[in-house]
UniProtKB/Swiss-Prot annotation:
Residues holding [4Fe-4S] cluster: C306, C366, C369
Subunit structure: Heterodimer of LeuC and LeuD.
Lineage: Bacteria, Pseudomonadati, Campylobacterota, Epsilonproteobacteria, Nautiliales
Protein name: 3-isopropylmalate dehydratase large subunit
Protein source organism: Nautilia profundicola (strain ATCC BAA-1463 / DSM 18972 / AmH)
Keyword Iron: yes
């Protein structure tokens, strides 16, 4: 029976063919928790009477949302995680000593492998599909069950094939591809579907951008986003192996040519501009030319998050900001996604460029993205952010506004004091 890549991953795990709509129980290759969600899982784990993790080397806790802790409550959450990690001698425990946002850190650590089934107690766990894995977010109780058994249940999703055709223009990145898709299909246009990203644009899309693309699959309601293994995946893993061993060998799957899709969406990117998603939904995408005409003044620019806090994002921002100054009315906050990215940006002189331009460079953290700290918006304030959500109150006050963009638009806007087109600089 012809199958998609997502279906093949599940079929390989349970030893037989699967079809959409079927409910299965499946071994999980990597289970992920963070400082916010894991304490609930730990409580359920302890209440179950379990004494040890089913797969300790396949379980990771990443302290990333409020690290270093912002207050007593977040410090206590971190302590619950630390105590559990030390008690169980958890190998894959990451805190201030080796910090990063989970969805960018774990691929760096060689813990995300093509062909994996991955679950995490965070909705943006779908990021890891960029490496050809099935990866999805679940609730803390589901995570606890997997901690105890090493398994989880899944309903096999139908797949939507998204074909990006043509060639990307100047300052058009993975972020713009996913914003365009969400603009077309809406925030529930892929509800419980697997979004399979294909086409000549994807074949030439760098891994950082593929991760941005898969990261926001959930913003269309998708169960997962996925890109098939290819030379770019291989090159990424070879780079990872220079500083971390891979957890296991890749298991490579490709969709059959006659696989069944619930929908095929073709997007010609030849004329696609950088996009800006207006408040209060990621689906409110508008071309940068329209945003410039709307003359939208801003108070803050935030470059970071699991979507766009990568080294390539910092390089893009530095290229635009070099020799320039942030507008006197604007705050620019830059948050590298991992400590390795931070160190490499420092090595390349990127941090000096950003600081000289007037930016604040924060430690790796989710921080302001979820309205946590390190860049919260006040009443009536307006921000351009390279994050993934712009719901009302997402980054602070309920009367604030967040406009989502790529890093080039964000950097240009920081200079102009209003939403600006980086192609005009």
């Amino acid at each position: 029976m012809p199958m998609t890549i997502t279906e093949k991953i599940f079929a390989e795990h349970i030893g037989r063919e699967v079809k959409p709509g079927e409910i299965i129980m499946c071994d999980v290759d990597m289970t992920i928790g963070n400082d916010i969600t894991t304490p609930i899982s730990i409580r359920a784990f302890n209440e179950s009477g379990a004494e040890k993790l089913a797969k300790p080397d396949n379980f990771a806790i990443v302290l990333d949302h409020f690290i270093p802790p912002k207050d007593i409550a977040s410090a206590n959450q971190a302590k619950i995680n630390r105590d559990f990690a030390y008690k169980h001698d958890l190998k894959n425990f990451f805190d201030e000593k080796d910090m990063g946002i989970e969805h960018r850190l774990l691929p760096e650590k060689g813990l995300v492998i093509p062909g994996d089934v991955i679950i995490g107690a965070d909705s943006h766990t779908c990021t890891h599909g960029a490496l050809g894995a099935f990866s999805t977010g679940m609730g803390s109780t589901d995570i606890a069950f997997c901690m105890i058994t090493g398994k989880s249940w899944f309903k096999i999703p139908e797949s939507i094939k998204v074909v990006f055709k043509g060639e990307r223009g100047e300052h058009v990145y993975g972020k713009d591809l996913i914003l365009e898709l969400i603009r077309r299909i809406g925030v529930d246009g892929a509800l419980y579907k697997a979004l399979e990203f294909t086409g000549e644009v994807i074949e030439n899309l760098p891994m950082d951008d593929r991760m941005s693309l898969c990261n926001m699959a959930i913003e269309a309601g998708a169960k997962n986003g996925i890109v098939a293994y290819d030379k770019i995946t291989e090159a990424f893993l070879e780079e990872v192996k220079k500083y971390n061993p891979l957890r296991s060998e890749p298991k490579i799957h490709y969709s059959d040519p006659d696989a069944n899709y619930s929908q095929v969406i073709e997007i010609d990117v030849n004329k696609l501009e950088p996009l800006v998603a207006y408040p209060f939904l990621p689906s409110n995408g508008k071309p940068i030319s329209q945003a410039v005409k709307d003359d939208i003044e801003i108070d803050q620019v935030y470059i970071g998050s699991c979507t766009n806090g990568t080294l390539s994002d910092l390089r893009i921002a530095a290229e635009i900001l070099k020799g320039k100054r942030v507008h006197r009315r604007v705050r620019l906050i830059v948050t590298p996604a991992t400590q390795r990215i931070y160190k490499q940006a420092e090595h390349e002189g990127i941090l000096d460029i950003l600081i000289d331009a007037g930016a604040v460079v924060a430690n790796p953290t989710c921080g302001a993205c979820l309205g946590g700290y390190m860049g919260i918006l006040g009443d009536g304030e307006r921000a351009v952010a390279t994050t993934n959500r712009n719901f009302r109150g997402r980054m602070g006050s309920r009367s604030s506004e967040v406009y989502l963009s790529n890093s080039a638009v964000a950097a240009a806007s920081a200079i102009a004091g209003k939403i600006a087109d980086p192609r005009d600089l």
